[in-house]
Amino acid sequence: MAFALRFFTCLVLTVCIVASVDAAISCGTVAGSLAPCATYLSKGGLVPPSCCAGVKTLNSMAKTTPDRQQACRCIQSTAKSISGLNPSLASGLPGKCGVSIPYPISMSTNCNNIK
């Protein structure tokens, strides 16, 4: 009986771990959410409400460590496609949208270290 309980516990933990790894956010979702931010990130001015909506959506989706790490990688990848991106505007964007994230928005952020 004890063996069966341990086996069941290990099985449940394995399913939970696999489910969280598979839950990573896609880069397409990140790029789509941040698309309304492109002009602001390169030219400044007022942050469009649709940009902040995307930032807030991404923040609410990135609940697990794999999700946050994937979101970080996708943000870095998406940032490379924004012509004339201003790194200062990018790093300050979450705060401008009233969002607190547990890592800096920067091309030098090591996404593997994000928890």
UniProtKB/Swiss-Prot annotation:
Plant non-specific lipid-transfer proteins transfer phospholipids as well as galactolipids across membranes. May play a role in wax or cutin deposition in the cell walls of expanding epidermal cells and certain secretory tissues. Keywords: Disulfide bond, Lipid-binding, Signal, Transport. This is Non-specific lipid-transfer protein 3. The keyword Transmembrane does not apply. GO terms for biological process: lipid transport; response to abscisic acid; response to water deprivation. PROSITE patterns: PLANT_LTP (PS00597). SMART domains: AAI. GO terms for cellular component: apoplast. One of its GO terms (molecular function) is lipid binding. Residues 1-23 form the signal peptide. Belongs to the plant LTP family. The keyword Nucleotidyltransferase does not apply. Disulfide bonds join 27-74, 37-51, 52-97, 72-111. It comes from Arabidopsis thaliana.
